[in-house]
Amino acid sequence: MSGRFAFNKGLKEVRFLFCQTGEHSAATRSFLLRNYPAMKKDNPATPILIRDASGTLPKVYARFEFGKEKSQSLEGLSDQQIEETVSSLVKNNS
């Protein structure tokens, strides 16, 4: 499990947006409950922001050096698909 979420060195911040009660965000909430401790342990210096607001569609943002930002919708994805999406997003800054 260690290193599964080893972030790219150019990554400055990861942000998760989702609804705290909506069914469309259930997989995102489950993913974060299960994986946040491992992500933070593997990347203690990188801020991982969790923003929940009523009615918000699930999405993840990755901010890289020089202000470059990428985002990916997590709507309709399973817990496993979210893990793959986040892993891919935080390892690529191209």
Swiss-Prot record:
Localisation per UniProt entry: Mitochondrion inner membrane
Keywords, in A-Z order: Electron transport, Membrane, Mitochondrion, Mitochondrion inner membrane, Respiratory chain, Transport
Location, primary (coarse class): mitochondrion
Membrane topology, record value: Peripheral membrane protein
Record carries keyword Transcription: no
SUPFAM superfamilies: Thioredoxin-like
Pfam families: L51_S25_CI-B8 (PF05047)
Keyword Oxidoreductase in record: no
Any single GO CC term annotated in Swiss-Prot or TrEMBL for this entry: mitochondrial inner membrane
Biological role: Accessory subunit of the mitochondrial membrane respiratory chain NADH dehydrogenase (Complex I), that is believed not to be involved in catalysis. Complex I functions in the transfer of electrons from NADH to the respiratory chain. The immediate electron acceptor for the enzyme is believed to be ubiquinone.
Subunit structure comment from the entry: Complex I is composed of about 40 different subunits.
Family of this protein: Belongs to the complex I NDUFA2 subunit family.
UniProt-recorded name of the protein: NADH-ubiquinone oxidoreductase 10.5 kDa subunit
Gene giving rise to this polypeptide: nuo-10.5
